[in-house]
Regions:
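Short alpha-helical donor nucleotide-sugar binding micro-motif in glycosyltransferases
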Residues: 150, 251, 259-264, 345
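Conserved donor-binding/catalytic core segment of Leloir-type glycosyltransferases
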Residues: 195-230
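Aromatic "clamp/platform" in nucleotide-sugar-dependent glycosyltransferases that forms part
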Residues: 272
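Short hydrophobic beta-strand element within catalytic cores of glycosyltransferases
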Residues: 289-292
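A charged, aromatic-enriched C-terminal amphipathic alpha-helix characteristic of glycosyltransferases
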Residues: 323-357
């Protein structure tokens, strides 16, 4: 994998010079899920269309679905064969991105292999680690499946260099780079604080409230002020009972979510299993510094200690991050755009145009 920093800007003229393409993105993750995969696919598709590319998104809303046993909000598509192949044949995409490893992803992968079509995959979630937290299955067993799934692709796209290294060590080697972005017009500092009546400083958590996000590490911190959690998930009821002093506000979206980011004095990111963490960019764009562990994701995003603090002692990181410059955070986040994200994707997609002709 060639090293490209995630905040490297891509010149507009290089975008405009590319041929118009028909691109299919296959994603088992879709609304009503609220996660980085859905936001990345959706925002990238918008940016690609703004560049005059045609984008088809194959997602569970077009299929019969059942809830995933461990994640009921994730819908697993049932009637994928032969419908996925027929939908691809109707659209005749120049490039195919398989964004997830679920039933839709498997159907698209197998169809491409059977027809000799080149395809690109995306690794966005450390499901082997998530599975290990719930059932006693060794990660190496789960990674055998991911090797099978990803290794036939032309390239396995990852958002960071550290994730590429992580996957190389687990037998997935053909990695490429697909960056991430943030809407700096939506995520920006807001004048009025919706949390103005709470004791300061306000330490903010934004994300899924579940075991794999390590939320307890945040709630157990002995820090001054107020802890506010934005999000929902299977661990929410228990954590609300165990930590009555914390404020749980549920899921927030759009401008209201941005106002919560802006109201915080620090975003605390306790996860050690994420592959990137879009919430890091969203908080920084709102002028809120970050405190996190020095792990995959944060070490790639928070390259400048003027915008966040990484420490194995999360309490030290939180205390040190409070008071960092909001302007520095905002300026740093402005380097990450969805237009650049679309550009990095385009540079890694294979061309099947001759196959359909």
């Amino acid at each position: 994998m060639s090293v490209i920093h995630t905040n490297e800007k891509i010149q507009p003229q290089s975008l405009d010079s590319w041929d118009q393409r028909k691109i299919t993105i296959v994603s088992d993750a879709w609304h009503p899920q609220v996660n980085g995969v859905v936001r990345t696919v959706e925002a990238t598709a918008v940016a690609l269309r703004e560049l005059d590319h045609q984008v088809q998104i194959l997602n569970p809303s077009e299929f019969l679905t059942v809830p995933c046993p461990m994640y009921p909000e994730i819908r697993l598509s049932l009637d994928v064969w032969p419908r996925v192949g027929k939908l691809l044949e109707e659209f005749c995409p120049d490039s195919i991105l398989i964004a997830t490893e679920g039933p839709l992803g498997i159907a698209a992968r197998n169809y491409c292999i059977s027809k000799g079509l080149k395809f690109t995959t995306n690794f966005n979630t450390k499901f082997p680690e998530y599975i290990r937290l719930r059932v006693p299955i060794p990660e190496r067993w789960s990674y055998k499946y991911f090797q099978w799934f990803h290794n036939p692709s032309e390239s396995v796209l990852v958002p960071t260099e550290s994730l590429a290294t992580y996957l190389h060590e687990r037998g997935i080697k053909n990695t490429g780079w697909w960056s991430r972005g943030v809407d700096i017009d939506l995520f920006r500092p807001y004048d009025e604080s919706i949390l103005q009546d709470l004791p300061r400083p306000i330490s903010l958590y934004v994300g899924r409230i579940s075991v794999e996000k390590n939320v307890n590490a945040f709630l157990d911190l002995d820090i001054p002020g107020t802890k506010v959690l934005v999000g929902n998930g299977p661990a929410m009821d228990k954590l609300k009972s165990d930590y009555p002093e914390a404020i749980f506000v549920g899921e927030k979206h759009g401008q209201e979510l941005a106002q919560y980011y802006s109201a915080g004095d620090v975003l605390v990111f306790p996860s050690t299993t994420d592959t990137f963490g879009l919430v890091l960019l969203e908080a920084l764009a709102c002028g809120t510094p970050v405190a996190a562990y020095p792990v995959c994701g944060p070490v790639d995003v928070i390259k400048d200690n003027h915008v966040g603090i990484l420490d194995n002692d999360l309490q030290k990181a939180v205390i040190a991050a409070i008071g960092l410059s909001s302007d520095d955070c905002r300026n740093y986040a402005s380097n990450f755009s969805w237009r650049n994200c679309a550009a990095s994707l385009l540079s890694n997609l294979s061309n099947n145009r001759s196959v359909w002709n």
